Amino acid sequence: SIMNKRFLSKKVQWITAIFITHLMFIVTCLDVLAHNPHDPVLGLGISPNFVNDKTLFVATYGELTDWSYPDIMRSTNGGLTWTRLPNGMDNRGKFSSIRVSPNFSSDNTVFVTTLGTGPGVYKSTNRGNSWQPFNTGLLNRHVTELKIARSGATDYVLFLAPGGGELYRSSSTQANWSIVLEPSSAMISVIAVSPDFMQDSTVIVARTTGNLLISTDGGTQWNDKGIPAGAIIYDITIAPGN
């Protein structure tokens, strides 16, 4: 009948409108997700010469959005566009931090740390174009924190905390890691290196219990300052000249 034809026509129009609306929503979402990096950023590394080279590195966690695997990305135009840098990362796991050498302009070196069953540390000496595991001597490869500081005109020192409460040290002149704080039931939650490390060799670490440990000889000897009353330490910054 005429009434049935009109009803069917309106029903088809209604279904078509719903389909187009959903299609537009999907396309819009794809456009949004196409802007990389769109995943949660777990680490940020900035070139010390950013003013001139506009170079940034980010570590993303794509598994949270089910869109991609964890990635290391680089931008050389201040973040306008990004390039994935997976070459050599056979077992990426979940990234925890990314650090750029203080001598990046000359040594092109970048470090990335991983959690879980990954290699612990990846190192690149060509601005992220390729990576190699850097974990000789590293017994615990669940790395939660890594800090880097200039230790000479062309040298740097690295301090690394895995999940077992110990602290490791390495440097630009070493190919391995060595323990400078023994394992403990209290994990290391924060590492801070002095901005004047070349002069004062100062490193401060905080444990999950609140204990502060200070070294003024680059991590060889440590002074436990105890637990600040009622303190939960989330971060430490050392002022220049102190």
Where are these regions (language model features)?
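Extracellular glycan-interacting surfaces
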Residues: 7, 14-25, 29-242
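N-terminal secretory signal peptides that target proteins for export/translocation
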Residues: 1-11
